[in-house]
């Protein structure tokens, strides 16, 4: 199968936004106008084409970035839908990593919202060019110029309108194209029929003044144009367009367009802007990588004649075809049925079928080309962030880093049948999502799942029930406490058993002392003169390490502790590895009364973004949660509070913050370090754990 669209005519874009800016509806309309969907699916009726997981349809939010392919005016546009909720930032990062450009959707009433800032920052980190679509122009309170000003104030973005809306709220009927200086007026409900006319008289002055500032801003990006502009020459439309494209591709300029996806206005013009201003794979710098096992850096240029290199950016379990691995091809081509090397894991993979995905239907293709996004069926060892490449030209493209889970809860299957299914289901979910972890608690035998926040785990439990038909009881969220010691002490551990036949004899003296924070466990053998024979030393270390896992006061693992074995004795006949192991664990038990053991709790670094008027309330709440405010800063017209707060106090915070700020506050939280639990609280935890 020959290549259908050239690299120059390919666009890989993402649609990014705050949770309710209308991102999914915008994607939906793009699919409608590009002929991929015959009936428009509405998010608030729960039938959107992109939101294909049941929970997404119920909650009306987008969780998984589905990759879809569409065609517009002889170009292929691959669209990745990204979630806008703070618990899913890993999905956003993952999709930004493989995009060449993005459309940032804003709500015309709110402008830049806090989650927009988060996503915008992530896009800046990855150097992703953006155009801005100010959506919901039909909404009460819609204000185009206010929204543009929030881009400049809150994001310090060099953003300029290339359209001016005609009317607003219920009177929004179209826009003035500031480059062509023509008005586009919508003539029907589906937005298929547009009339292009002269700019209405009452919009002329504003349109001319906006065009003037657009020309000036564009001229600043290009020396030749600047000279022409200063000499009073008129810039041609083609020069303007070329300069806007260059500025956008260099991430120095952000063109702004407007519309209402829900009312079908402005989406075709948005698609035109995607073709005009966002980069093709040829406009983006060649991707860098390393030759496995060396420090040698190599680049992969976009082109079908180059060696094959691709990045897997999403793994999903599909009810019909099994495991799907979404990947972006950076160079070369790939045929179904061929073999490639997973350079990250150093494994050979056979590519079974290759599918081009459209939100929830799929088309089988035999070849993918450079710049394409597709999904492969049948990959065994590939997970998110892995590089797939030609077996003779190995390369590892930069990988993605994922944060550790901050919240855990236990899940207990309701029946024996659920037990077996649950293990398989959790393994599949962990494969799809690198920020989700699962393990068995050795003491209680419970299965524990960990993730990035409460919504994250809610959705995992929901998927267990729906997709994998596993019924499970869910425990309350739990914090991972730790223990350590505050004073050094020398303690004895002696295990003697003599009752006919061969006895047991192990005897050690160990000095336990606090280690530096984060240094973990250190063991030192200071035996001289063979008072404890060399072959028993590893058993002493193993005995202490095992005992540390079971805790000293409340059964939580002991961290940051040194153990120095400096004396002891043995018996020629009765001593054994087991006897010394037990003696060592008894030494740790005896240290409890001498070493001043304490309980530690995880402390999260929390950043809360709220409008000024809620500051007092939020600060008071942070203090009430035993938090320590480290600093504050203004960000646009919002305030950012930076604080350290115990994780145990942060459960339910998303809901609490939402109600305190009428949904205008957002927060992000990452684990930072462990700190001692205040005595009164520690006593309660110990009592609960030990039943004493």
Curated annotation (Swiss-Prot):
Gene field: fusA
Name of the protein in its database record: Elongation factor G
Gene Ontology terms: cellular component: cytoplasm
Keyword terms of this UniProt record: Cytoplasm, Elongation factor, GTP-binding, Nucleotide-binding, Protein biosynthesis
Matching CDD domains: EF-G (cd01886), EFG_III (cd16262), EFG_mtEFG1_IV (cd01434), EFG_mtEFG_C (cd03713), EFG_mtEFG_II (cd04088)
InterPro entries: EFG_II, EFG_III, EFG_III/V, EFG_IV, EFG_V, EFG_V-like, EFTu-like_2, G_TR_CS
PROSITE patterns associated with the record: G_TR_1, G_TR_2
Subcellular location per the Swiss-Prot or TrEMBL entry: Cytoplasm
A Pfam family hit: EFG_IV
GO molecular function: GTP binding; GTPase activity; translation elongation factor activity
Residues reported to bind GTP: 17-24, 81-85, 135-138
UniProt similarity note: Belongs to the TRAFAC class translation factor GTPase superfamily. Classic translation factor GTPase family. EF-G/EF-2 subfamily.
SUPFAM superfamilies: EF-G C-terminal domain-like, P-loop containing nucleoside triphosphate hydrolases, Ribosomal protein S5 domain 2-like, Translation proteins
Top-level taxon of origin: Bacteria
Domain tr-type G: 8-282
Cited function: Catalyzes the GTP-dependent ribosomal translocation step during translation elongation. During this step, the ribosome changes from the pre-translocational (PRE) to the post-translocational (POST) state as the newly formed A-site-bound peptidyl-tRNA and P-site-bound deacylated tRNA move to the P and E sites, respectively. Catalyzes the coordinated movement of the two tRNA molecules, the mRNA and conformational changes in the ribosome.
Annotated source species: Shouchella clausii (strain KSM-K16) (Alkalihalobacillus clausii)
UniProt-listed GO biological process terms: ribosome disassembly
